[in-house]
Regions:
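Rossmann-like dinucleotide/phosphate-binding beta-alpha-beta segment
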Residues: 1-86
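Rossmann-like dinucleotide-binding domain for NAD(H)/NADP(H)
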Residues: 87-178
Length: 178
């Protein structure tokens, strides 16, 4: 039951604010941790990033929405994951490397973490490596992980814009070949 859960938002930008509003509609308690204090009618308690472990200790579901910067890379490390309740879930829609890859895998495999929904990854295809696994670790073998292919931000509008871009690119390519 969502109404009895505490949602933690790691980062409080546009995406997290939208998630907070929806969580409150379900009656959830909402906590947020951010580098700067931001007031919101949808947040019951705000934490500084320097209080990360205290923030995580009271969370049932943590949603990582942080961008990848020198300050955020590996922010959610083994110690941070240990601060979470064993029944907690981690959802990453920010950037993969904000959460330490090996630490996350180990916490999930040992069942110290209830589960994870991962939409952002550690490895992506490149022109020289068009096919690659999303991680060097076998997250797919774990029964407490839901994996999505970095698509949480996609909407029908996103798909439509991409289709138009592809059509325009194809048309330009064909015209330039003539």
């Amino acid at each position: 039951e969502l109404g009895s859960q505490t949602l933690g938002l790691l980062g409080f930008g546009h995406i997290a604010k939208a998630i907070a509003a929806r969580a409150k509609a379900f009656g959830m308690r909402v906590h947020a941790a951010n580098r700067s204090t931001v007031m919101s009618q949808h947040v019951d308690r705000m934490f500084a990033l320097s209080d990360l472990h205290a923030f995580l200790a009271g969370i049932d579901i943590v949603v990582v929405t942080l961008p990848l910067t020198a300050q955020t890379q590996g922010l959610v490390d083994a110690a941070a994951l240990q601060a979470l309740r064993p029944s907690a879930w981690l959802v990453n829609v920010g950037r993969g490397p904000v959460v330490a890859e090996q630490a996350l895998y180990d916490a999930l495999k040992s069942k110290h973490l209830g589960g994870a929904i991962i939409d952002t990854w550690y490895q992506y295809p490149t022109p020289t490596l068009p096919e690659c696994a999303p991680s060097k670790l076998d997250f797919a073998a774990l029964d407490n992980v839901v994996m999505t292919p970095h698509m949480s931000g996609w909407t029908s509008g996103t798909v439509h814009r991409r289709q138009l871009t592809m059509a325009a690119t194809t048309s330009v390519d064909r015209l330039s070949d003539d």
